[in-house]
Amino acid sequence: MAVLASSNSHAAPRSLDRTRIKRLISSCGIEAWFVQDSTVPLISMEYAFTGGAAQDPAQRPGVAHMVSGLLKEGSGKFDFKTFHQRLDRHAIELRFHVTHDHFRGALRTINDSAEEAFELLRIALTSPRFEAADVERNRAAVLARLRHDSTDPSSLARRKFLEVAFGDHPYARPVDGYLESVPKIEAEDLKGYVRRVIAKRHVQNRGGRRGRSRGRLQAAR
């Protein structure tokens, strides 16, 4: 990941020359690659859980993809509106993305908002609400994209390639599901995916249980 900023175009290379990656292990055994950069008051973190869209129920492809779009739509005691107000107020960016093998996420914020950012990330990952209105809004957006893709030659070719290349393997199923499968996805499917995949034992990055962070943050924190 990268968090690098300078008002001097010649300062960046010197900063990079001094960059040192620290290997940290948390009290619960999660390894992180940490780079401290005091030139900008920003924190950036990337992480991944093993078990992406390949973990979707066979009859409901698209579950993991919907989860990635719903974790910011209300979690814990915060509904959709309140959650987004807190993100905006504290200049916090949370992103989630799913592939066949991984559920990935990223956090970016200013240093002064670190505690709030990590707390909002925690409740997003551990206490998503999946309220009916939010689920249906997300479902409608997914279906709109799928309808568009159903007439797009490139999308059709990509899906056909996956089917031919992988046959009955979960890799043959598109990450965002099918027009026929997405309407069948229920809140319990979403909750079940979170229970199975969003867990400490699945934290991984590039072959190990790692996350990557960079910015103006002390290693001890």
Whereabouts are the PLM-identified features?
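An aromatic/glycine/proline-enriched structural segment found at the starts
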Residues: 3-13, 167, 171, 175, ...
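Mature N-terminal segment immediately following signal peptide/propeptide cleavage
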Residues: 14-46
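M16 family metallopeptidases and their MPP-like homologs
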Residues: 33-35, 39-69, 80-126, 139, ...
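Short, polar/flexible loop-turn hinges at active-site or ligand-entry regions and domain interfaces
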Residues: 74-77, 125-133
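Alpha-helix N-capping/helix-start residues
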Residues: 80, 132, 187, 213-214
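Short, charged, amphipathic alpha-helices and their helix-cap/turn boundaries
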Residues: 182-186
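Conserved, carboxylate-rich catalytic/transport cores that coordinate ions
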Residues: 194
